[in-house]
């Protein structure tokens, strides 16, 4: 499923959080929205999810216009920053939670939950509660819950930010491997440059509610279009100096 945003603007009272954003996310790619706090990346994700309605512009899923369609009818899977697991429900019930709203027959739940837990390597954890799991395991339960819905689009809002730095790398690799094996269109939000450069097929860098550059990790690092992009992507991109002379082959 490819996603297109055309001229999308979002205001909160007098504040323009997103300004005329044009974006094409290709079918099956992992696209990361990267930028500092307050740049508009989470607002963009929430517009794609249907939590917000744009003041201007269009959002397309394939050939379907969705900006007025509720979240429940967009066939998305969402993993929140805090995982949003029900503490009083077992892993099984958490993963199956969305199936009741999609009116999936209860007889199908065991198979679907088992398939989702198999994908994230948590078969055997069905009867445990979130409080009995590590942070990485909770994150995988949240991912399994999203995948159980068989979504066309997977949305992840800073899913690793609550994890210990020691396990962040391994969970990041698991997410990438799973996304590639499923071939699902994935939109990932982070402020962490290393995460974005490691995970993504392409990255959109945001600043002050605008998309300032889109490209592969290599292109953004090697060919930043602005000083902001160069500075945000990596400290090695900027070299301070004074031009004293210009020759044919050297400066």
Report residues per predicted region.
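ABC ATPase nucleotide-binding domains
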Residues: 30, 71-77, 81, 85-231
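The feature captures the beta-strand-to-loop junction immediately N-terminal to the Walker
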Residues: 34-36
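Conserved coupling/switch loops of ABC nucleotide-binding domains, chiefly the family-specific signature
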Residues: 55-58, 108, 208, 240
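Helix-to-loop junction immediately C-terminal to a conserved catalytic motif
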Residues: 49
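Conserved ABC transporter NBD signature motif
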Residues: 57-65
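ATPase nucleotide-binding modules
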Residues: 225-251
């Amino acid at each position: 499923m490819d996603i297109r945003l055309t001229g999308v603007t979002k205001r909160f009272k007098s504040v323009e959080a997103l300004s005329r954003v044009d974006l094409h996310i290709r079918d099956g790619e992992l696209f990361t929205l990267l930028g500092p706090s307050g740049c508009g990346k989470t607002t963009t994700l929430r517009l794609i999810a249907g939590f917000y309605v744009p003041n201007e512009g269009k959002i397309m899923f394939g050939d379907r216009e969705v900006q007025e369609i509720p979240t429940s009818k967009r066939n998305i899977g969402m993993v929140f920053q805090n995982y949003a697991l029900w503490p009083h429900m077992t892993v099984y019930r958490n993963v199956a939670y969305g199936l009741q709203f999609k009116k999936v027959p209860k007889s199908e739940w065991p198979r679907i939950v088992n398939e989702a837990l198999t994908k994230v390597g948590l078969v055997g954890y069905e009867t445990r509660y979130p409080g009995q799991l590590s942070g990485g395991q909770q994150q995988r339960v949240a991912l399994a819950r999203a995948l159980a819905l068989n979504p066309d689009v997977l949305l992840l809002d800073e899913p690793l930010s609550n994890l210990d730095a020691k396990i962040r790398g391994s969970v990041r690799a698991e997410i990438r491997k799973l996304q590639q094996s499923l071939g699902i269109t994935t939109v990932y939000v982070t402020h962490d440059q290393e995460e974005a450069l490691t995970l993504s097929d392409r990255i959109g860098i945001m600043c002050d509610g605008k998309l300032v550059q889109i490209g592969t990790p290599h292109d953004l690092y090697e060919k930043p279009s602005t000083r902001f992009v160069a500075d945000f992507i990596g400290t090695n991109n900027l070299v301070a100096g004074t031009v004293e002379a210009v020759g044919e082959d050297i400066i």
